A protein has these predicted regions:
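Receiver (REC) domain switch-region micro-motif
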Residues: 141, 241-243, 266
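Acidic, histidine-bearing metal-coordination/catalytic regions of metal-dependent phosphoesterases
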Residues: 1-115, 120, 131-137, 312-345
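Extended active-site neighborhood of metal-dependent phosphoesterases/phosphodiesterases
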Residues: 35, 67, 85-101, 154-240, ...
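Short, motif-level signal for alpha-helix interfacial/capping segments enriched in acidic residues
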Residues: 124-125, 247-261
């Protein structure tokens, strides 16, 4: 009898504790994000979907204790090279937070960024990649295309992009190259580019973050992309420089002659592998292993000129600085699988 009373009393205490003392975390009012876009040395933007924007206040806190309130989601008047903590409140209650590192103005500053490709599957592997990316605290994340499978339908953006990469996108903008799965429907690629605020037309553009420059060329090196690259590389750039196409460059590709000696590396995806290759004197890094998976082995064969090749899931960390550029492939379990250091140009 006494044991029964004690059991009932304990259950009652636990019920009261869980219901009234612990309280409820409540539902997340944001259906997308918040996530960072448009990051420069003095400005940043945080976007979201869900609550009425009139009820949301975005505040960025600098290391020195000063704060800036966003207008229309945009922070201006920021200090360069500083990590800001941002908080989103809804009706005065903090509901989301993150941070971003404004671009440095020091040409000798080192910049860390991530690279992924063929990732937009919304599966457990992509979530693992997203967690790994967040752990390296990148300034931005470059994608090598195929951001959404099988098509870049707006209804799939959250499943394939914004939810798996939620944590890293709360601190680093996604610099998107479009792949053939993204552009199969023309509106799909444009929708992704608009959502992440890609510069220009969202297909061919140049992104600059401090001393780092990335030239984004879309699916492959057609005549229009080669012409864009010639114009871009005709302009001097003293810092680390990169190029990205969705489909990897092959020996004899006319783009290789344009970029030889002018880039630290050329990134690509499409092949669902990670590969490191030297092609006509240019370091090529294929990052097609970030979520979708290898598929049919018949169509996922190692490239003949590959120095290193694997179908294991992973992402790339790039540390670019005045002493050179270190490019590392990290697998979904957090192990370093490949590393190469590129001396300054």
């Amino acid at each position: 009898m006494l044991v029964g009373v004690v059991v009932i009393a304990v259950i009652g205490v636990l019920f009261y504790w869980n219901s009234y003392l612990l309280g409820s975390r409540g539902d997340d009012p944001f259906t997308r994000g918040p996530y960072v876009v448009g990051l420069t040395s003095t400005a940043a933007e945080v976007r979201f979907l869900g609550p009425d924007p009139a009820k949301v206040t975005l505040t960025a806190l600098a290391p020195n204790g000063t704060s800036v309130v966003a207008k229309g989601g945009k922070f201006v008047g920021l200090e360069s090279g500083q990590r800001y903590l941002w908080t989103a409140t809804v009706d005065g209650m903090g509901q989301a937070s993150g941070s971003f590192l404004t671009a440095p103005t020091d040409p000798q500053a080192a910049v860390t960024f991530g690279v992924i490709g063929d990732y937009g599957a919304g599966n457990a592997h992509e979530y693992a990649i997203g967690r790994g990316l967040a752990a390296i605290d990148p300034s931005f994340v470059l994608t090598c295309g195929d951001n959404s499978y099988l098509l870049a339908l707006p209804a799939l953006y959250d499943r394939n992009i914004f939810t798996p990469l939620h944590d890293v996108m709360a601190e680093a903008p996604l610099i998107v190259d479009l792949g053939d799965h993204d552009t199969f429907l023309s509106a799909g690629g444009k929708g992704i580019a608009d959502a992440v605020a890609s510069p220009g037309d969202g297909i061919t553009y140049t992104y600059e973050y401090g001393p780092v420059q990335v030239v984004v060329l879309g699916v492959e090196s057609s005549a229009a992309e080669v012409a864009y690259a010639k114009a871009a590389f005709a302009k001097p750039w003293n810092g680390p420089r990169f190029i990205v196409t969705h489909k990897a460059l092959k020996p004899g590709d006319p783009l290789l002659a344009v970029i030889k000696g002018k880039v630290d590396a050329a990134f690509a995806g499409h092949l669902h592998r990670y590969e490191r290759r030297m092609v006509d004197g240019v370091l090529n890094i294929t990052v097609g292993n970030s979520g979708e998976g290898p598929g049919n082995p018949e169509f996922t064969k190692q490239t003949p000129e590959a120095v290193y090749s694997t179908m294991d899931y992973g992402f790339v960390r790039v540390i670019a600085g005045p002493a050179g550029t270190k490019i590392q492939m990290i697998d979904e379990a957090g192990a370093l699988r490949d590393s190469v250091t590129v001396p300054p140009r």
